[in-house]
């Protein structure tokens, strides 16, 4: 992996696999966001879908907003989004979440950042979001990447696969320290996105869904997590909420787990490293038992002052 941008540049086949192998958020996910936005006096003019990939959620945002800005760091992803979504109510830009000079100050009603904020340096990301949001606008960040399996043996093997893959991704990065921080942010309780009360209304909601048995599966070993851990971005006035919610569970088989694996950047790194772990999992589920689990999800909802 020579640059971070290469991690994000994906072709159409990858996005087909991504839709098979990742959570498809239930309607309640979007209803929660729209309800929060409406309850806090937000308008439904412009929404910025940042770090959008090929825009899998952009059409849902368009169902409520007049204009959707779809942006991603990878030009190929933006082209795929443009081909699929068209220009009716959509505009497109190639940019990082941190890049905001071309977005007029205070012009966006809602910033939607799903499965991307762990890649963003927290203070720079906050500056970009604050600049573009209108007063009373909504910032929503969410993370629902790694699955969590009901069977503890399956979960144990999956954790070892994830940690092994994460370490190799870090070792091959141009900037291993930066990628280690990304991996730490994307694990456990997805502690991202500072919302300083001088910039956001006190009471940011940090909602943990389906985390009774743990948060997002770690993609770093415990010793690496401790070494790279950042200060918590959960403020003293934030509202931490823990809930169970229907619509995030799944039942799959070994091929389904492999589809999930294929959605992670480390899936193409040294495949022989994972051979023994896959053999262990294949032997364990050889009797045809279904593999059940859920998608833990973190949702952060904040209102600009």
Curated annotation (Swiss-Prot):
Ordered alphabetically, the record's keywords are: Methyltransferase, S-adenosyl-L-methionine, Transferase
Q: Which InterPro entries match?
A: Diverse_substrate_MTase, Methyltransf_11, SAM-dependent_MTases_sf
Provide the E.C. number(s) assigned to this enzyme: 2.1.1.-
* An example Gene Ontology biological process: methylation
Top-level taxon: Eukaryota
Task: Name one molecular function that GO assigns to this entry.
Answer: S-adenosylmethionine-dependent methyltransferase activity
- From the UniProt record, give the pathway where this protein acts: Secondary metabolite biosynthesis
Q: Does the keyword Protein biosynthesis apply?
A: no
Note whether Cell division occurs among the keywords.
no
Region annotated Methyltransferase domain, chain positions: 49-140
Q: What biological function has been recorded for the protein in this entry?
A: Methyltransferase; part of the gene cluster that mediates the biosynthesis of pestheic acid, a diphenyl ether which is a biosynthetic precursor of the unique chloropupukeananes. The biosynthesis initiates from condensation of acetate and malonate units catalyzed by the non-reducing PKS ptaA. As the ptaA protein is TE/CLC domain-deficient, hydrolysis and Claisen cyclization of the polyketide could be catalyzed by ptaB containing a beta-lactamase domain.
Q: Which family does it belong to?
A: Belongs to the methyltransferase superfamily.
Name of the molecule in the record: Methyltransferase ptaH
State the gene name recorded for this protein: ptaH
């Amino acid at each position: 992996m020579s640059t971070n941008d290469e991690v994000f540049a994906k072709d159409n086949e990858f996005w087909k696999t991504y839709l098979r192998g990742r959570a498809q958020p239930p309607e309640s996910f979007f209803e929660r966001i729209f309800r929060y936005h409406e309850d806090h006096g937000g308008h439904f003019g412009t929404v910025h879908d940042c770090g959008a990939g090929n825009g899998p959620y952009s059409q849902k945002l368009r169902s409520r907003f007049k204009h959707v800005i779809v942006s991603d760091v990878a030009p190929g992803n933006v082209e795929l989004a443009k081909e699929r979504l068209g220009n009716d109510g959509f505009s497109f830009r190639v940019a990082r979440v941190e890049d905001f000079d071309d977005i007029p100050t205070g012009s966006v009603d809602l910033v939607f950042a799903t499965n991307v904020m762990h890649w963003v340096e927290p203070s720079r990301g906050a500056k970009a979001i604050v600049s573009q949001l209108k007063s009373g606008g909504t910032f929503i960040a969410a993370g629902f990447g790694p699955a969590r399996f009901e069977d503890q043996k399956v979960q144990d093997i999956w954790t070892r696969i994830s940690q092994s893959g994460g370490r190799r991704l870090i070792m091959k990065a141009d900037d291993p320290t930066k990628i280690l921080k990304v991996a730490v942010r994307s694990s456990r309780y997805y502690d991202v996105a500072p919302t300083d009360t001088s910039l956001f209304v006190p009471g940011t909601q940090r909602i943990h869904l389906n985390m009774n048995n743990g948060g997002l599966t770690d993609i770093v070993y415990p010793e690496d997590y401790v070494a790279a851990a950042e200060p918590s971005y959960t403020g003293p006035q934030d509202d931490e909420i823990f809930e169970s919610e229907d619509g995030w569970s799944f039942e799959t088989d070994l091929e389904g787990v492999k589809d999930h694996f294929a959605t992670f950047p480390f899936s193409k790194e040294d495949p022989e490293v994972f051979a023994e772990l896959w053999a262990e999992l294949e032997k364990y589920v050889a009797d045809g038992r279904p593999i059940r689990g859920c998608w833990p999800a973190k949702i952060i909802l904040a209102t600009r002052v």
